[in-house]
UniProtKB/Swiss-Prot annotation:
Residue ranges constituting the DAGKc domain according to the UniProt record: 1-129
HAMAP family per the UniProt record, alphabetical: YegS (MF_01377)
Molecular function in Gene Ontology: ATP binding; lipid kinase activity; magnesium ion binding
Record GO cellular component, one term: plasma membrane
Record organism: Pseudomonas fluorescens (strain Pf0-1)
Main subcellular localisation: cytoplasm
Cofactor info, note text: Binds 1 Mg(2+) ion per subunit. Ca(2+) may be able to substitute.
The protein's name in its UniProt record: Probable lipid kinase YegS-like
Family designation: Belongs to the diacylglycerol/lipid kinase family. YegS lipid kinase subfamily.
EC number in record: 2.7.1.-
Binding locations of Mg(2+): 210, 213, 215
Chain's role: Probably phosphorylates lipids; the in vivo substrate is unknown.
Length: 305
């Protein structure tokens, strides 16, 4: 790249982050023209991306949590090929960045400005974009707090049911999923549809997901009614919840459920009874570590035939 120029769109809560300030100053000392803009309210990310592109920026840095990354990725995807994205993970979960092996240290993360950009996929449903993952579940009662009983039953997977709304009761509902050469129907407890691999602060739902294969990884947690009643015993006996998932890898999948399915798109809520998820292949250029586990090339190297 001839001009070392980038714009950092930083979540407003991170304005006083000294590590970020030091990292920015360090890049400036290296000769980068690095400008910073802060988000304050909904819609700011979209506006700031548009202003950055109009000002000639071709590298944009997203500084914040998974929601901030999603907002900026969505804004960039609306203007394909205009600029590439660097991720500066500053949230509590940082699920996409962790799975991609992006450093959580601001100075190291900004070194990706020098790394090649890769064309990666995005997930799409109902006109909304997600960079990392969509998770969904059913709740018969919604409360303000995470159910402690539910946490005890499900352990690390509890977020599946509490990530969007705090469900005080765990129950299944009938669902049907259909995609190319794939059809599943039955009682469904929860599901994950991943472009990335993990959600909810490190819980791996789609362990083999790649961001440049043009596919979404589907993980279904089925639940015949008799299984719901014995789920606690199964888990306490060492029957890992990971073994219970039905998995598929598809360019798109249609989901129909008997009652409203609560979906979490990288923190954004969505609800529906008939939804179509699709991968938008190569929709975004992102700077990733050369050995990122989410890249197909890395996968081939580490898993030779």
């Amino acid at each position: 790249m001839s001009e070392r120029k980038a714009l950092l769109i930083l979540h407003g809560k991170q304005a006083l982050n000294e590590a970020v300030r030091a990292a920015v100053e360090n890049k400036r000392k290296q000769g980068w023209k690095l400008a910073v803009r802060l988000t304050w309210e909904a819609g700011d990310a979209q506006r700031l991306v548009e202003e950055a592109l109009a000002a000639g920026y071709r590298q944009i840095i997203a500084g914040g949590g998974d929601g901030t990354l999603r907002d900026i990725a969505e804004a960039l995807a609306k203007q394909p090929g205009k600029a590439s994205l660097v991720l500066l993970p500053l949230g509590t979960a940082n699920d996409f960045s962790r799975a991609a092996a992006i450093s959580l240290e601001p100075a190291e993360a900004l070194e990706l400005l020098e790394a090649p950009a890769h064309d990666i996929d995005l997930g799409e449903v109902g006109g909304q974009i997600f960079l990392n993952m969509a998770t969904g579940g059913f709740g018969s009662q919604v409360t303000a707090n995470t159910s402690e009983d539910l946490k005890k039953v499900l352990g690390g997977a509890a977020y599946l049911f509490t990530g969007l709304s705090r469900f005080s009761e765990l129950h299944a509902a009938y669902g049907e999923l259909q995609g190319p050469d794939f059809h599943w129907r039955g009682e469904l407890l929860a599901l994950g549809i991943g472009n990335g691999r993990q959600a909810g602060g490190g819980h791996v739902l789609c362990p083999e997901a790649l961001v440049d294969d043009g596919l979404l990884d589907i993980s279904i947690l089925p639940a015949p009614q008799e299984l719901v009643g014995t789920l606690k015993n199964l888990l306490s006996d060492g029957f890992g919840i990971d073994n219970m998932f039905v998995r598929a890898r598809l360019p798109w999948v249609e989901i129909k459920v008997a009652e409203g399915l609560y979906i979490n798109l990288d923190g954004e809520p969505l609800e529906g009874e008939s939804l179509r998820f699709a991968a938008r292949a190569g929709a975004l250029r992102v700077h990733l570590p050369k050995d990122s586990p989410l890249l197909s090339a890395t996968h081939r190297i580490s898993h030779p035939d």
